[in-house]
Protein backbone atom coordinates (compact mmCIF):
# COMPACT_ATOMS: atom_id res chain seq x y z
CA UNK A 1 0.00 0.00 0.00
CA UNK A 2 1.34 3.41 -0.97
CA UNK A 3 1.06 5.52 2.19
CA UNK A 4 2.48 8.59 0.44
CA UNK A 5 -0.93 9.23 -1.10
CA UNK A 6 -2.54 12.48 -0.02
CA UNK A 7 -6.08 12.02 1.27
CA UNK A 8 -8.67 14.81 1.54
CA UNK A 9 -11.77 13.91 3.58
CA UNK A 10 -14.75 16.27 3.24
CA UNK A 11 -17.58 16.37 5.74
CA UNK A 12 -20.36 18.60 7.11
CA UNK A 13 -22.03 19.13 10.50
CA UNK A 14 -25.55 18.08 9.52
CA UNK A 15 -26.12 15.35 12.05
CA UNK A 16 -23.28 13.64 13.86
CA UNK A 17 -22.90 10.68 11.48
CA UNK A 18 -21.06 12.50 8.69
CA UNK A 19 -18.47 13.99 11.05
CA UNK A 20 -18.05 10.74 12.99
CA UNK A 21 -17.39 8.79 9.79
CA UNK A 22 -14.85 11.42 8.70
CA UNK A 23 -13.11 11.17 12.08
CA UNK A 24 -12.99 7.37 11.88
CA UNK A 25 -11.65 7.45 8.32
CA UNK A 26 -8.97 9.93 9.39
CA UNK A 27 -7.95 7.74 12.32
CA UNK A 28 -7.79 4.64 10.11
CA UNK A 29 -5.72 6.41 7.46
CA UNK A 30 -3.25 7.54 10.14
CA UNK A 31 -3.21 4.05 11.68
CA UNK A 32 -2.41 2.59 8.25
CA UNK A 33 0.53 4.99 7.95
CA UNK A 34 -0.79 7.60 5.53
CA UNK A 35 1.38 10.69 5.96
CA UNK A 36 -0.92 13.33 4.48
CA UNK A 37 -4.55 13.22 5.60
CA UNK A 38 -6.69 16.36 5.80
CA UNK A 39 -10.28 16.66 7.05
CA UNK A 40 -12.31 19.68 5.97
CA UNK A 41 -15.78 20.79 6.99
CA UNK A 42 -16.13 22.31 3.53
CA UNK A 43 -19.41 24.20 3.91
CA UNK A 44 -18.50 25.60 7.33
CA UNK A 45 -15.15 26.79 5.98
CA UNK A 46 -16.55 28.29 2.78
CA UNK A 47 -19.89 29.73 3.93
CA UNK A 48 -19.94 29.92 7.75
CA UNK A 49 -23.14 31.97 8.04
CA UNK A 50 -25.12 29.87 5.55
CA UNK A 51 -23.78 26.74 7.21
CA UNK A 52 -24.81 27.91 10.69
CA UNK A 53 -28.32 28.85 9.53
CA UNK A 54 -28.91 25.57 7.67
CA UNK A 55 -27.51 23.53 10.58
CA UNK A 56 -29.89 25.38 12.90
CA UNK A 57 -32.83 24.65 10.59
CA UNK A 58 -31.77 21.01 10.33
CA UNK A 59 -31.71 20.65 14.12
CA UNK A 60 -35.01 22.51 14.47
CA UNK A 61 -36.60 20.13 11.98
CA UNK A 62 -36.52 17.42 14.65
CA UNK A 63 -38.47 19.48 17.18
CA UNK A 64 -40.93 21.00 14.71
CA UNK A 65 -42.14 17.62 13.58
CA UNK A 66 -41.81 14.73 11.23
CA UNK A 67 -43.26 16.57 8.24
CA UNK A 68 -40.64 19.32 8.35
CA UNK A 69 -37.85 16.76 8.85
CA UNK A 70 -39.14 14.71 5.91
CA UNK A 71 -39.18 17.84 3.75
CA UNK A 72 -35.60 18.64 4.79
CA UNK A 73 -34.35 15.05 4.42
CA UNK A 74 -36.32 13.74 1.46
CA UNK A 75 -37.36 16.98 -0.28
CA UNK A 76 -33.95 17.46 -1.84
CA UNK A 77 -34.76 14.94 -4.57
CA UNK A 78 -37.79 16.96 -5.64
CA UNK A 79 -35.76 20.12 -6.33
CA UNK A 80 -32.51 18.47 -7.45
CA UNK A 81 -33.02 19.08 -11.17
CA UNK A 82 -34.47 22.55 -10.77
CA UNK A 83 -32.45 25.62 -11.76
CA UNK A 84 -32.55 27.07 -8.23
CA UNK A 85 -30.69 24.01 -6.95
CA UNK A 86 -27.67 24.93 -9.10
CA UNK A 87 -26.33 27.04 -6.22
CA UNK A 88 -25.81 23.82 -4.26
CA UNK A 89 -23.60 22.52 -7.08
CA UNK A 90 -21.30 25.49 -6.52
CA UNK A 91 -21.35 25.73 -2.72
CA UNK A 92 -17.82 25.36 -1.44
CA UNK A 93 -16.27 25.51 -4.91
CA UNK A 94 -13.76 28.26 -4.10
CA UNK A 95 -12.70 26.60 -0.83
CA UNK A 96 -12.43 23.21 -2.56
CA UNK A 97 -10.10 24.75 -5.15
CA UNK A 98 -7.96 26.19 -2.34
CA UNK A 99 -7.83 22.81 -0.58
CA UNK A 100 -6.88 21.01 -3.79
CA UNK A 101 -4.15 23.56 -4.56
CA UNK A 102 -2.81 23.47 -1.00
CA UNK A 103 -2.93 19.73 -0.31
CA UNK A 104 -2.72 18.24 -3.83
CA UNK A 105 -4.89 15.24 -2.86
CA UNK A 106 -4.56 11.93 -4.66
CA UNK A 107 -7.95 10.87 -3.26
CA UNK A 108 -11.04 12.78 -2.12
CA UNK A 109 -13.48 11.07 0.23
CA UNK A 110 -16.92 12.61 0.84
CA UNK A 111 -18.84 11.71 3.99
CA UNK A 112 -21.56 14.23 3.10
CA UNK A 113 -23.36 14.48 -0.26
CA UNK A 114 -21.30 17.20 -1.94
CA UNK A 115 -21.94 17.64 -5.63
CA UNK A 116 -19.24 20.32 -5.69
CA UNK A 117 -16.43 17.71 -5.91
CA UNK A 118 -17.59 15.85 -9.04
CA UNK A 119 -18.68 19.16 -10.56
CA UNK A 120 -15.18 20.54 -9.84
CA UNK A 121 -13.73 17.54 -11.69
CA UNK A 122 -16.09 18.09 -14.61
CA UNK A 123 -15.38 21.83 -14.85
CA UNK A 124 -11.60 21.76 -14.35
CA UNK A 125 -10.75 18.45 -15.99
CA UNK A 126 -8.70 17.53 -12.90
CA UNK A 127 -9.41 13.87 -12.28
CA UNK A 128 -8.94 13.16 -8.59
CA UNK A 129 -10.38 9.76 -7.60
CA UNK A 130 -13.51 10.54 -5.61
CA UNK A 131 -15.23 8.19 -3.18
CA UNK A 132 -18.54 8.76 -1.45
CA UNK A 133 -18.97 7.09 1.93
CA UNK A 134 -22.74 7.22 2.13
CA UNK A 135 -23.90 7.70 5.68
CA UNK A 136 -27.59 7.97 4.78
CA UNK A 137 -30.02 5.07 4.79
CA UNK A 138 -31.87 6.26 1.71
CA UNK A 139 -30.50 7.23 -1.68
CA UNK A 140 -30.54 10.98 -2.30
CA UNK A 141 -29.77 12.14 -5.82
CA UNK A 142 -27.15 14.49 -4.42
CA UNK A 143 -24.95 11.51 -3.51
CA UNK A 144 -24.89 10.32 -7.14
CA UNK A 145 -22.81 11.76 -9.95
CA UNK A 146 -21.03 10.33 -12.99
CA UNK A 147 -17.73 11.74 -11.68
CA UNK A 148 -17.81 9.76 -8.43
CA UNK A 149 -15.59 6.70 -8.74
CA UNK A 150 -16.86 4.51 -5.89
CA UNK A 151 -19.70 4.45 -3.41
CA UNK A 152 -19.36 2.85 0.01
CA UNK A 153 -22.82 2.19 1.43
CA UNK A 154 -24.21 1.26 4.83
CA UNK A 155 -27.06 -0.98 3.70
CA UNK A 156 -28.02 -3.44 0.99
CA UNK A 157 -31.08 -1.25 0.36
CA UNK A 158 -28.91 1.70 -0.73
CA UNK A 159 -26.69 -0.62 -2.76
CA UNK A 160 -29.71 -1.99 -4.62
CA UNK A 161 -30.99 1.54 -5.27
CA UNK A 162 -27.60 2.57 -6.72
CA UNK A 163 -27.51 -0.52 -8.91
CA UNK A 164 -31.11 0.16 -9.92
CA UNK A 165 -30.22 3.58 -11.35
CA UNK A 166 -27.39 2.13 -13.40
CA UNK A 167 -24.32 2.42 -11.18
CA UNK A 168 -21.85 -0.30 -12.17
CA UNK A 169 -21.70 -3.07 -9.52
CA UNK A 170 -17.90 -2.76 -9.22
CA UNK A 171 -18.37 0.87 -8.11
CA UNK A 172 -20.56 0.01 -5.10
CA UNK A 173 -19.07 -1.51 -1.95
Q: Model-found features: residue ranges?
A:
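A short, glycine/small-residue-rich beta-strand->loop->alpha-helix junction that serves as a flexible
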Residues: 12-21
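Structural motif
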Residues: 106-107, 150
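Short His-centered aromatic/hydrophobic patch
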Residues: 111-114
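Conserved N-terminal ligand/cofactor-binding loop architecture of enzyme catalytic domains
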Residues: 24-97
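Short, well-ordered alpha-helical microsegments
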Residues: 18-19, 46-47, 116-118, 139-141, ...
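Active-site-proximal region of nucleotide-activated glycan assembly enzymes
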Residues: 124-173
Amino acid sequence: MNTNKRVLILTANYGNGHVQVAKTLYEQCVRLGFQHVTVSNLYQESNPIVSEVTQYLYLKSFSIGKQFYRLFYYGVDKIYNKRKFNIYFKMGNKRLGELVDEHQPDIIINTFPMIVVPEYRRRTGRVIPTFNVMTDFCLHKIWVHENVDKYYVATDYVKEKLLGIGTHPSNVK
